[in-house]
């Protein structure tokens, strides 16, 4: 195992997870998790499009920070726990995340090629 990439991912993951936790404490509820997942998808789209061969930055920001920031498991548990809003919650999260990732990639490409 390479220690430098592992440390970079761990540091980024700590930043992302603590940020998600702080937001969920400040703004409790399923819609905060939906917003976090959509925002994380947007930012990951930007990172994926903008960062070239710099492996450590991609690992820090993509796998670490944004991997720790977003959460599929909490999304799934929230959907099960809130059956009355589950369909809307799932649709908003999935469609929003896909649209945000696409928009982030387009923005990242535009920024990279300017």
Where are these regions (language model features)?
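Membrane-interface helix-loop junctions in multi-pass transporters/channels
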Residues: 1-114
């Amino acid at each position: 195992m390479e220690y430098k990439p592992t440390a970079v991912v761990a540091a980024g993951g700590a930043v992302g997870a603590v940020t998600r936790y702080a937001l969920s404490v400040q703004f409790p509820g399923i819609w905060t998790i939906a917003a976090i997942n959509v925002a994380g998808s947007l930012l990951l789209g930007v990172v994926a499009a903008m960062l070239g061969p710099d492996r450590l930055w991609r690992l820090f920001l993509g796998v670490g920070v944004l991997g720790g920031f977003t959460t599929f498991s909490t999304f799934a548990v929230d959907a099960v726990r809130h059956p009355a809003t589950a369909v809307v919650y799932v649709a908003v999260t999935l469609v929003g995340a896909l649209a945000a990732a696409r928009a982030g990639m387009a923005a990242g490409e535009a920024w990279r090629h300017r």
